[in-house]
A protein has these predicted regions:
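Alpha-helical transmembrane segments and terminal signal-anchor/GPI-anchor hydrophobic tails
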Residues: 245-255
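N-terminal hydrophobic segments of proteins, predominantly signal-anchor/transmembrane helices
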Residues: 6-25, 40-108
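Structural signal for the C-terminal ends of transmembrane alpha-helices
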Residues: 43-56, 111-122, 198-204, 236-247
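Alpha-helical transmembrane segments of multi-pass inner-membrane proteins
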Residues: 126-154, 168-245
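Juxtamembrane membrane-water interface segments that cap and precede transmembrane helices
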Residues: 18-27, 89, 164-180
Length: 255
């Protein structure tokens, strides 16, 4: 059976996002998020193998911004103090390489979304991505309630920012949800963008109102002020954009 090229691109995107959500794990001392970011670079050979057409894609001024950020990063790399933080698990060269890869991967994700928009509807793309948020939220809730239900928690293979692994009962002075991440705040910030996506999808399918409970509960249990503020700001921005679009439509109708 012939594999459609858009399915390959979609699989790479979703796998990358999922691996980014497994922040607390590594294999052969390589963190899963690093694999996730590196997977996006597979788009480059895939582009040549399947001869993707880029003529219809419009990156506008984004490519110039990416070039600027890359230039600043490389220049600063030579003038920065080479001493890494005490609990850093990577060398300075690895840190710079990962940062450059992150910047390039951002550009690749924008390209992927534009490419997929030629084959899938906007709602389909959002739904695929939203399911990743639901899966990570379920895993985080399992980890959190494993303490109460005496279930085995995940065997995390990466240390937290304090330099030691964090069993859930001592994650903080109060029990906090950090799920598949090394810190509760990391989980909170990662979860926030998925909540508006759930409510967007709920406009046409009520099941997303139910599914939105999972990332919201996961966020609340992190007890992260940063995460709560982030979701409030995100919802405010979404509401503002919606109101502006509605107002614009009404003005166009009047005139």
């Amino acid at each position: 059976m012939k594999i459609k090229k858009q399915n390959i691109v979609l699989s790479i995107l979703l796998s990358s996002i999922f691996l980014e959500g497994l922040d607390a794990f590594s294999i052969f001392a390589v963190p899963f998020p690093w694999f996730g970011v590196s997977m996006l670079l597979l788009i480059i050979p895939t582009y040549y193998v399947f001869n993707f057409d880029l003529t219809s894609l419009n990156f506008g001024s984004l490519k110039y911004w990416i070039l600027y950020v890359l230039t600043v990063t490389i220049i600063k790399a030579f003038s920065f103090d080479l001493e890494m933080p005490q609990y850093a698990t990577s060398t300075y060269s690895q840190f710079i390489s990962l940062r450059v890869t992150k910047i390039i991967s951002f550009f690749i994700v924008v390209w992927i979304i534009q490419f997929l928009a030629s084959y899938l509807t906007k709602d389909q793309i959002i739904e695929y991505i939203a399911y990743i948020g639901v899966i990570i939220s379920v895993l985080s809730l399992y980890s959190y309630f494993s303490f109460f239900l005496d279930f085995p928690d995940f065997n995390r293979t990466r240390a937290g920012s304090g330099g030691w692994s964090q069993p859930i009962q001592r994650a903080c002075s109060v029990l906090r949800n950090y799920g598949t991440f090394r810190e509760p705040s990391f989980l909170a910030v990662w979860t926030v963008p998925f909540i508006p996506l759930n409510f967007y999808l709920a406009r046409k399918n009520n099941k997303w109102y139910f599914l939105s409970i999972l990332p919201i509960l996961s966020l609340i249990l992190t007890r992260s002020l940063t995460g709560v503020i982030s979701v409030l700001v995100a919802c405010l921005v979404v509401l503002l954009v919606y109101l502006l679009k509605t107002k614009k439509l009404k003005l166009n109708f009047v005139y």
